[in-house]
């Protein structure tokens, strides 16, 4: 008879959602400690219908990597908002109306999950990443919370290194 209260056969250490680092290229000036939360990569595969008579069969179609949301805290100095808006200006400049070249604004970002001792146990490389949405948040006289910035990042592809 099976013992339903049996403990797990192998002790393990789970990955924790509060042990992660998002690394941006040093040329952007976006420090790792600015990040307060981030989503892990997610992918979507389209299903393609193949109709035949009264039935349908499905096969996998194109796949896409979903956009990633990252939240930053915004200290006075060094300013996260200034670093992010400088990267945004490589995409589009609101003063002159000029648009940037993809080679200039697309960057490779690294997302790392850590074990309890700080060793990287999961690493993603987000290739060709750029900003699609940048929200500097709300201000409120009735609130003493830390100012945050919401950013949506779109990437060409994600590679899980390990």
Model segments located where?
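Glycine-rich, low-complexity intrinsically disordered segments
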Residues: 1-162
């Amino acid at each position: 008879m099976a013992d339903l209260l049996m403990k797990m056969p192998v002790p393990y250490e789970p990955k924790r959602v509060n042990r992660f680092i998002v690394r941006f290229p040093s040329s952007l000036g976006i420090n790792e400690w600015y990040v307060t939360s981030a989503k892990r990569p997610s992918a979507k595969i389209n299903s393609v219908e193949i109709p035949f008579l009264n039935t349908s069969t499905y096969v996998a179609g194109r796949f896409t990597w979903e956009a990633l949301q990252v939240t930053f805290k915004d200290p006075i100095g060094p300013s996260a908002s200034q670093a992010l808006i400088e990267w945004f200006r490589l995409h589009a400049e609101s003063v002159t109306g000029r648009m940037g070249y993809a080679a200039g604004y697309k960057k490779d970002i690294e997302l790392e999950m850590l074990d309890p001792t700080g060793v990287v146990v999961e690493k993603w490389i987000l290739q060709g990443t750029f900003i699609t949405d940048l929200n500097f948040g709300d201000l409120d006289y009735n609130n003493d919370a830390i100012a945050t910035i919401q950013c949506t990042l779109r990437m060409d592809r994600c590679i899980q290194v390990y």
